[in-house]
Amino acid sequence: MAFNRRSKNITQGVSRSPNRSMYYAMGYEKADFDKPMVGIANGHSTITPCNSGLQKLADIAIKTIKDAGGNPQVFGTPTISDGMSMGTEGMKYSLISREVIADCIETAVNGQWMDGVLVIGGCDKNMPGGMIAMLRTNVPSIYVYGGTIKPGHWKGKDLTIVSAFEAVGEFTAGRMSQEDFDGIERNACPSSGSCGGMYTANTMSSSFEALGLALPYSSTMANPDDEKVGSAAESARVLIEAIKKDLKPRDIVTRKAIENAVAVIMATGGSTNAVLHFLAIAHAAEIDWTIDDFERMRKKVPVICDLKPSGKYVATDLHKAGGIPQVMKVLLDAGLLHGDCMTITGQTVAEALAHIPSVPSADQDVIHTIDKALYAQGHLAILKGNLSPEGCVAKITGLKNPVITGPARVFDDEYSAMDAIMANQIKAGDVLVMRYLGPKGGPGMPEMLAPTSALVGQGLGESVGLITDGRFSGGTWGMVVGHVSPEAFVGGTIGLVEEGDSVTIDARQLLIQLNVSEEEIARRRANWKQPAPRYTRGVLAKYAALASTASKGAVTG
């Protein structure tokens, strides 16, 4: 049986002689034209430690695909470092890079008639961008995550990149010495690999394991470790078998599979960005999945992993404790996973987990049993109210003050808000309203890790609320609400809030409310005028023109 189902369109027949000439220039032989053409979307980059260790994974995938009878075709995908661009205009390109990555992979795979694709990525948007492309093209595919960074250390404490962000607030508030500030900066990131807590990169990679399009244990391996190279090689072998069986992403990514992925996100305390990305992933798969489905899942899936940012441990600790397979086994036995979902290996979820113990090891405290869950319900809540009738996203577990009503401190950009925080002008009880930062208004929904971390560092993480139509980093915690929809730029109520207005965030009632009369809101709405777009040319302008509302994933098509 021929396995070059697609690539034969570009390699076979008399009319394709010029095509073959170009392949011969790259060392191909005649027999190679009967083999599958397998794309390797390589996200290697020296921009960020998240991606600086990916080339070795691409190299082993190339060798393995050749050895298994395929023709590897390598092409690059871009990346943006969320951590480095945070707090700058560059952060506006982060979410946009999700769309660019998806478009790049779709363009290469379909333009070159590839028979399958292995996607390698590291930083946050690499994962959803790659998955969206895999689902759009729907050729046999597998995701190879670059792996997590190892924790840093300073004076006996484990560090992550969030430690450095929070140190900024502590230092400016006079709560940290210069020695400790410099020590944390120098030691927070000790190796290659993606940010080490259950932040966005590790959240998305973990969910891809649960989804069935990444190999077991692959999402919690550290990039510097040899097992990560071994996992990449095995991923390439599995992909060749999937090509032979014509097992495609849309055979695997069903509504039930998305429920499995979201269950793992809830159980591990994952990033708010997962809400946005899975709306986009479902859209690419043409699956009916809405923002309200996250709330439905939250109510039935407990948090069973004690992981940063709100918990104690990092991804390497989770790996030692049994990784995502152990988390999934606990959920499966509790009836919280669909065991009949297919995975890229050809096994069902239940078959893949058959050898995993039902009870996590007693010599670890990372993964809990259901009866000893950290929180009885999930942490990613969908709040609604007159400030966000389409819904917005908040992390609500572990809050000492689940309800806050306070005066609005209104900022139309991130930088003025950050200046106010650094000048100690924000006080306990305030509710920061940061707006015109949505998909169209930002544009690009920049993340607010810099201001939220500064608040935490100043000791205000539990006593100040923050509302935005932008996003939050996976490293954010506290009384923060993002993805407010409709956004300010299209006339959402968040754009009508005035300085000093009373605003309520109620995590118990899942309510977000501007405490102003309907008549007053109507008056303000009648007087509101849409501001001029911040960008009129280039990729930011393109995204602003095309992006959907955050409640539908901020997708472009």
UniProtKB/Swiss-Prot annotation:
It catalyses: (2R)-2,3-dihydroxy-3-methylbutanoate = 3-methyl-2-oxobutanoate + H2O; (2R,3R)-2,3-dihydroxy-3-methylpentanoate = (S)-3-methyl-2-oxopentanoate + H2O. Its cofactor is [2Fe-2S] cluster; Mg(2+). Pathway: Amino-acid biosynthesis; L-isoleucine biosynthesis; L-isoleucine from 2-oxobutanoate: step 3/4; Amino-acid biosynthesis; L-valine biosynthesis; L-valine from pyruvate: step 3/4. This is Dihydroxy-acid dehydratase. Functions in the biosynthesis of branched-chain amino acids. Catalyzes the dehydration of (2R,3R)-2,3-dihydroxy-3-methylpentanoate (2,3-dihydroxy-3-methylvalerate) into 2-oxo-3-methylpentanoate (2-oxo-3-methylvalerate) and of (2R)-2,3-dihydroxy-3-methylbutanoate (2,3-dihydroxyisovalerate) into 2-oxo-3-methylbutanoate (2-oxoisovalerate), the penultimate precursor to L-isoleucine and L-valine, respectively. The gene is ilvD. It is an enzyme of class 4 (lyase). [2Fe-2S] cluster binds at residues 50, 123, 195. Binds 1 [2Fe-2S] cluster per subunit. This cluster acts as a Lewis acid cofactor.
